[in-house]
Amino acid sequence: MTITVEPSVTTGPIAGSAKAYREIEAPGSGATLQVPFRRVHLSTGDHFDLYDTSGPYTDTDTVIDLTAGLPHRPGVVRDRGTQLQRARAGEITAEMAFIAAREDMSAELVRDEVARGRAVIPANHHHPESEPMIIGKAFAVKVNANIGNSAVTSSIAEEVDKMVWATRWGADTIMDLSTGKNIHETREWILRNSPVPVGTVPIYQALEKVKGDPTELTWEIYRDTVIEQCEQGVDYMTVHAGVLLRYVPLTAKRVTGIVSRGGSIMAAWCLAHHRESFLYTNFEELCDIFARYDVTFSLGDGLRPGSIADANDAAQFAELRTLGELTKIAKAHGAQVMIEGPGHIPMHKIVENVRLEEELCEEAPFYTLGPLATDIAPAYDHITSAIGAAIIAQAGTAMLCYVTPKEHLGLPDRKDVKDGVIAYKIAAHAADLAKGHPRAQERDDALSTARFEFRWNDQFALSLDPDTAREFHDETLPAEPAKTAHFCSMCGPKFCSMRITQDVREYAAEHGLETEADIEAVLAAGMAEKSREFAEHGNRVYLPITQ
């Protein structure tokens, strides 16, 4: 079926910045690769380059044609194995060189982390529109944004718009979780226009092919669906192969049972047929298919906890042990692997999840949904989960799957997508700071300096969301002169601590009080003066009162 759509997407640079590129040479082919950055031009005359995920949509020199799709990047190789296999062979691929420039890391570090299985480069040979990126704990923490239609609402145009909107605000990957009509067509439009890797959960489309009845699923239907998606260019796929028949009873006394859609589908199939999941029994064949296209496994946590009460229970960790076994099998076949994690976990139980995943899964990159640190805030779960996300990322999680304010309530719209992405970029960056990631603090320092110097426009431009920062400032001080004023509406001109601090510093400079030695010298001189004055008055402690 042909779908005619004319999606309308946001283009143009983010406020206060422009698209910039760093040119590098692709190893082997010699092709020129353009590595993108968001360049913030500061009022001081300097500039600050930021990691950028927005693709050509923020480049004023690019004409966007959604029907034609994005241009293909050079250096794509289809017949020399996976990134894992090539890294093990000592090769630095074009994708690794691109990532090294993007992350400001050495290409050898990129290759070594991929070779060890501690990082993955989701880059299907059939998705040349994407800009290479890496997921691993040695690199900046990444954020995934889920989009996709449902049987109730949304359209292809809306989902393409959400994809562009999410990447504009910093989504490093996109997952198309469509479960409604036209799943193939929706995915095609997204893939051809996505500058970031795209992930899916193939069991959703396979279920559509059997009219929504999990018991009618077969390995053949699932396998053909996977190949269809590989051919389209899907970069990574969630596979719930760790949901085993014997684990299902472990969920019986849970407060919220099995909350993963894929997990519940496979549990229903196992119980109906009373045999092991076809994803588990055919896993090696699946590995060969993934390796053929260099599709990355995202081994799904189908038994993740959906409530604080169920956190870190027997079902969750039983599945994790099986995911560890499957990780070894996948890597033996040359397929890249990352591991999905929870879920709903109270703060004091979060770190245990990372430590166990690293132990059981050979330090494969951990990719977690939050986790939500409490269950009591529907409509604010982008906040409850960002708290858990920051903690788990500091502990070693490599990619965070965002949660929007609509979680548990409905399908997210454009505003929800942005709110979710921004909340998770905050969590990811906070974790990078805590881990001491190279260059992470440079942006904080640049913004803090601009704040102290009352360079309001520079503050806006360096922030995660320049539009909202400016909007909030304009609500009370909209005039242009306010953008250089040495105060804001919070404190006003007389109570601004930073202005007062500047006044103190100016006074100190004028009176030679800039160093500790200066201050000690002045204090000593003052004390000496008072000592002389005391002596001049006869060394008397009490002096007569004068009228």
Swiss-Prot record:
Keywords: 4Fe-4S, Iron, Iron-sulfur, Lyase, Metal-binding, S-adenosyl-L-methionine, Thiamine biosynthesis, Zinc
Pathway per the UniProt entry: Cofactor biosynthesis; thiamine diphosphate biosynthesis
Disulfide linkage: none
Top-level enzyme category: lyase
Pfam families associated with the record: ThiC-associated (PF13667), ThiC_Rad_SAM (PF01964)
Function comment: Catalyzes the synthesis of the hydroxymethylpyrimidine phosphate (HMP-P) moiety of thiamine from aminoimidazole ribotide (AIR) in a radical S-adenosyl-L-methionine (SAM)-dependent reaction.
Protein name: Phosphomethylpyrimidine synthase
Organism: Mycobacterium tuberculosis (strain ATCC 25618 / H37Rv)
Taxonomic classification: Bacteria, Bacillati, Actinomycetota, Actinomycetes, Mycobacteriales
